[in-house]
């Protein structure tokens, strides 16, 4: 079946074109590789953990859906956290790593972000420097292991009941639900959030594929 929501793409690849190396990044000077199967498993287990935080899409409106933010450079965990968030109906709010603390606090409050991922100590410290003034922000999880911070792996749960809930919820996510808020850099004023739906982003992917053809094969 053709993907309709962004997170459908992982299952689509797993069924038709599973890769031994879907994602890769250097960790401590050595390449860490992730297969499609491992990515899919991690995404689902992270979704299960996010459910235990009480997060959901609620009524699937931009106002009613819960939000999770991320401040990070490009890395495999970014994609996996993104898909895990979206497939339970929660809106993803990426923040540029170069965003200053004032704009960061504004974005988190404006989007009513409840939880956040930060990639490393520098960005974690930046988030923690504004946390007290962002009343809606409950907790920050990190990709790197940082003393005193909660590591994102704590949220990856292999619980059969929770994983079944994730599968049920995935089927209910409408294609026209907002998948992400993308904030402008704020160079001419306060950052402004742009709402992008699953449908709109996936349509752009399909049009890009037609403009720059590549085969549906490994």
Map each language-model feature to its residues.
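Conserved structural elements of the adenylate-forming
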Residues: 40-48, 175, 194-215
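A short N-terminal helical cap/helix-turn-helix that marks the beginning
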Residues: 1-22, 41
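Structural core segment of the AMP-binding/adenylate-forming
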Residues: 87-157
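Hydrophobic alpha-helical segments in the ANL/AMP-binding
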Residues: 11, 76-95, 104-105, 206-210
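Conserved AMP-binding/adenylate-forming core of the ANL superfamily
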Residues: 23-75, 79, 83, 100-105, ...
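Conserved AMP-binding A3 loop
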Residues: 33-36, 179-205
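Conserved pre-ATP/AMP-binding loop-to-beta segment of ANL
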Residues: 18-21, 142, 147, 161-183, ...
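Conserved S/T- and glycine-rich ATP-binding loop of Class I adenylate-forming
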Residues: 68, 85, 116, 178, ...
């Amino acid at each position: 079946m053709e993907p309709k929501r962004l997170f459908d793409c992982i299952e689509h690849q797993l069924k038709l074109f599973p890769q031994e190396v879907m994602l890769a990044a250097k960790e401590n000077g050595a390449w860490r590789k992730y297969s499609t199967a491992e990515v899919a498993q991690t995404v689902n287990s992270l979704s299960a953990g996010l459910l235990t935080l009480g997060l959901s899409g609620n009524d699937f409106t931009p106002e009613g859906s819960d939000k999770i933010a991320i401040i990070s450079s490009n890395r495999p965990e970014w994609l996996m956290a993104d898909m895990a968030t979206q497939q339970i109906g929660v809106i993803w709010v990426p923040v540029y790593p170069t965003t200053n603390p004032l704009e960061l606090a504004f974005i988190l409050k404006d989007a009513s972000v409840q939880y956040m991922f930060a990639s490393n100590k520098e960005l974690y410290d930046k988030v923690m420097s504004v946390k007290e003034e962002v009343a809606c922000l409950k907790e920050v999880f990190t990709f790197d292991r940082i003393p005193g911070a909660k590591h994102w792996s704590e949220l990856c749960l292999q619980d059969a009941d929770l994983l079944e809930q994730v599968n049920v919820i995935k089927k209910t996510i409408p294609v026209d639900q907002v998948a992400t808020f993308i904030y402008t850099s704020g160079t001419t004023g306060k950052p402004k959030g742009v709402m992008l739906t699953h449908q709109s982003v996936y349509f752009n992917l399909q049009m890009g594929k037609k403009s720059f053809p590549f085969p549906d094969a490994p």
